[in-house]
Amino acid sequence: MAGRFVWKPDLMFKTTLCALLITASCSTFAAPQQINDIVHRTITPLIEQQKIPGMAVAVIYQGKPYYFTWGYADIAKKQPVTQQTLFELGSVSKTFTGVLGGDAIARGEIKLSDPTTKYWPELTAKQWNGITLLHLATYTAGGLPLQVPDEVKSSSDLLRFYQNWQPAWAPGTQRLYANSSIGLFGALAVKPSGLSFEQAMKTRVFQPLKLNHTWINVPPPEEKNYA
């Protein structure tokens, strides 16, 4: 499996990408060579500044996709980034979780106003009274931590973690970004379907969107493309 690379984009990176999008959108009659020039002029300095070992960029212009790649997916093996390289989605996965929750709402399986305990009755601690799926989806449950602790290894550990959590403020009053919040929302949103989270994501989001090379668990034949 290719080595993993963790990179947190800063304000400069976000500003640069915005500039790329604006420049491309302003080029009403941009030819492929112009698009190539715009992308390389924008991205190449960024790669050098941020010391990014490998990167892929896709631009859709007038309905046509353009793909650009730089560097290595695996530095040790000198394996280059290609159009088939698989990158971890990171926090973009939260967008997919939101879409999956929206699909469950559209099917009439859940409502955002539903209490969390409706889908996890074992969550009996009093602090969960009044916390809804909406609070979980919008990070407003009361200050859930950024991550689920590493020592949580089983479903009973997970229940204990949420049972012992103590909110810092009332639900719906403040927002705090937390993987343990949106993650729980996704897990509960699929419960009425009887599907696992992975099954629901595959059949209700990935397949309808024709995301045929997007997985939660990369299948062994595709691991050679993993960055």
PLM ranges: what are they?
Residues 67-70, 74, 126-227:
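Short, surface-exposed loop or secondary-structure junction motifs
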Residues 48-56, 76-136, 167-181:
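Short active-site loop at a secondary-structure junction
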Residues 13-19:
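Sec-dependent signal peptide recognition
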Residues 33-87, 109-111, 156-165:
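Short, conserved catalytic-motif segment at the N-terminal edge
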Residues 25-27:
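N-terminal signal peptide c-region/cleavage motif recognized by signal peptidases
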